[in-house]
Amino acid sequence: ARTVGLTVFAAAGLILAGCGLGPGEDTGDVSLLVTRDYGSKVLVDEPALPANESSTAMRILDQNSDLETSYGGEYVQSVDGISGDTSGSRSFDWFFSVNGIVAERGSAQFPVGGKDKVWWDYRDWTDAMEVGAVVGAYPAPFSTGYDDRDWGVQIDCLSGEDACRMVTNQLEGDGVRLKDTGENMIVRVGLIDDVLDTPEGQRINKGPGASGVFVRFAAPDVGAPE
């Protein structure tokens, strides 16, 4: 009886393996952008690629480039011959974002579909390993949400009513849903001193190593025209 039971179980396993689960249903088109040096050079630009329930950030890249991986297929090592490397004291690798947010889990486990924007960038991360978001994906993530979370956007007007009104109009015109309650992304608008007084502003003032933001604030030239 034991032998028969094992045989039936094994046969069932072979049948299931033979059938396979397939790629799943279509989930809409995604865009794929592959660049280097923080987007300064475009290598691949595909605005509409078909995706399905098995599509991931890595699989979309693999289907549209010559991809090499490491660490058991979990890490992108090389794209079209451009490989992660160390040169002197500088380190270079591939990073990806979805809808403007740099993902916190591996690309092989990150599902994509339904108008998601997938962006891979090869860059020197020596001075700033943690870059939380990329402005080049705008209006994402404000208009798209992220990782199946449909966030709204709340505007925090620190100062400058005209500037706040302009930002509000711009966001709404770009399809962003503004709301004041629930889980939201916050856009702070104000004079530089007011912005730098916030926790986020204090991180920005510490440089890209602390904030991931490459920006330097300087006093305006008094003699320059407005």
Segment roles from a protein language model:
Residues 18-226:
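Ubiquitin-like/PB1-type beta-grasp interaction modules and other compact soluble beta-rich domains
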